Regions:
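Two-component/phosphorelay signaling modules centered on CheY-like receiver
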Residues: 12-32
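Helix N-cap/capping motif at the beta->alpha junctions
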Residues: 33-42, 64
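Short amphipathic alpha-helix used as the core "switch/output" element in two-component signaling
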Residues: 42, 65-78
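Active-site residues of response regulator receiver
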Residues: 56
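Receiver (REC) domain active-site loop signature in two-component systems and cognate sites
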Residues: 59
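Alpha4 helix (beta4-alpha4-beta5 surface) of REC/receiver domains from two-component response regulators
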Residues: 66, 88-102, 115
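Hydrophobic/aromatic residues positioned on beta-strands within the core alpha/beta folds
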Residues: 83-86
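C-terminal output helix
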Residues: 108-119
Length: 122
């Protein structure tokens, strides 16, 4: 199955690190990126073929929590898994309450990321 992943993080280096891990995964065929939740919402409207979102919480403009609220308010997005990647474990409950499917602590390990991708896209 071809898979398109959207990486949402305001930190350029974090986006590139995640992309490097994703490029090594044979399931991932395309990678899109967004600097904040607003950019991510725009990309999702323009490209409904995205299969998975990897989302940071702390971002300018529209943060990860606000993105989740807006994104999940549209029921047509219910089938798209969102995995939150964050250094802040204290916000786990908040991200799940707002529609995240899963949570990975940064720095993300390749095996953990691949496990979650398999879990949510199989």
């Amino acid at each position: 199955m071809a898979m398109k992943v959207l990486v949402v993080d305001d930190d350029f280096i974090n986006r590139k690190l995640i992309q490097t891990l994703l490029k090594k995964n044979p399931k991932v065929t395309e990678i899109e990126e967004a600097e904040n939740g607003s950019d991510a919402l725009d990309k999702m409207k323009k490209d409904p073929s995205i299969n998975l979102i990897l989302l940071d919480i702390m971002m300018p403009v529209v943060d990860g929590i606000e993105f989740l609220k807006i994104f999940r308010s549209d029921m047509s997005n219910a089938h798209i898994p969102v995995i939150v990647l964050s250094t802040d474990d204290t916000r786990k409950t908040e991200v799940f309450d707002n529609g995240a499917n899963d949570f990975l602590r940064k720095p993300v390990m390749q095996n953990d990321l691949y496990e979650k991708i398999d879990q949510w896209t199989s």
